[in-house]
Structures are given as C-alpha cells and as structure tokens.
C-alpha cells in the first residue's frame, strides 16, 4: 500500500508552524544585523571630523528595502543594543555609545522609511518614471533621516 503525503501531513504542518515562522523571522533579523555590522565596517576617514563616512547608511537602506520596515528596524535596533552593551559591532570594530552612536539610532529610521519606500514603489501604479521618482524621493528622505539623531548625539 502506498501512502501519499498531503499538506496536512506532519511535514506539511511543520513547514507552516508558528514556531518555524518565528525562527525564520529571527534568522532574517539576524542576517540583517550581520549585514549592518559587516557593511558598516567599510569606512572613509575624514581629516576634519572624528566621524567617518561609512557604508552603514547604505546597509540600513538595503536592509530596510529588502527585509521590510519591521524586520529592517528590528535589525537596526539589535545592532544598537549590541553596540550599547559594548559589543564591537560599529565601524573599526568599536562598541559602546561612541561619537557615531547617534547615526546607529538613525539606522532605525532609515530602515523604517526604506522598507515603506520599497512597499510603496512595488505597489505604485503610475508610469515607470513616476515610480522611479517616488522611490528616489523616499530613499533620499530615508538617507537624510540618519542625520537628525546623528547630529543631535
């Protein structure tokens, strides 16, 4: 006798279990945080300020756009939490509330806006030129949002 596996079988129900969904979500947030850490190590030092240009802003944009607002923001929050407790996750493998920590706070804003921008862009029903203009405007807003907490810090 041959038994067919159906979508109600143990394997099928495991694939759609809430526990597995939580593991997947946690894995995506961890991958986003790891991306922020590694890409944020790429820096361009400036002679007139202790704050270098880093690829962290780009990473926050990318993580927010790819993972969505919620997961992107959680990835940035996890990065901030790790840095706040002293883990060496910031540029130059530094940790703590250093001079650039305000920009890390801004990464949460960037991820939220970039995730929303990606959603709006994908659902925009106008012409391609209109979609590109909307996407560029929202990504520029996201990029600029890092400077508010960064400069205040």
Q: Which stretches of residues belong to each language-model region?
A:
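Short helix-perturbing small/polar motifs within transmembrane alpha-helices
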Residues: 2-17, 24, 38, 93-148
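Hydrophobic transmembrane alpha-helices
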Residues: 2-73
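Hydrophobic alpha-helical transmembrane segments
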Residues: 5, 43-55, 80-85, 119-133
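A general structural signal for well-ordered alpha-helical segments in protein cores
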Residues: 31, 58-60, 102, 110, ...
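Central hydrophobic cores of alpha-helical transmembrane segments
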Residues: 74-83, 138-139
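Interfacial aromatic-anchored transmembrane helix boundaries in multi-pass membrane proteins
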Residues: 41-52, 80-111
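Alpha-helical membrane-inserting segments
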Residues: 35, 39, 43, 63, ...
């Amino acid at each position: 006798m041959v038994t067919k596996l159906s979508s109600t079988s143990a394997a099928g129900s495991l694939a759609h279990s809430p526990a597995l969904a939580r593991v997947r979500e946690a894995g995506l947030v961890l991958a986003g945080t790891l991306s922020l850490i590694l890409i944020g190590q790429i820096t361009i030092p400036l002679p007139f300020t202790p704050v270098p240009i880093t690829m962290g802003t780009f990473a926050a944009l990318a993580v927010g756009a790819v993972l969505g607002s919620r997961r992107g923001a959680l990835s940035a929050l996890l990065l901030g939490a790790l840095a706040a407790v002293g883990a060496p996750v910031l540029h130059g493998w530094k940790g703590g509330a250093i001079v650039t920590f305000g920009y890390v706070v801004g990464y949460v804003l960037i991820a939220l806006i970039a995730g929303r921008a990606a959603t709006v862009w994908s659902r925009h029903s106008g012409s391609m030129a209109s979609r590109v203009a909307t996407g560029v405007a929202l990504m520029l807003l996201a990029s600029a949002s890092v400077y508010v907490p960064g400069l205040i810090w």
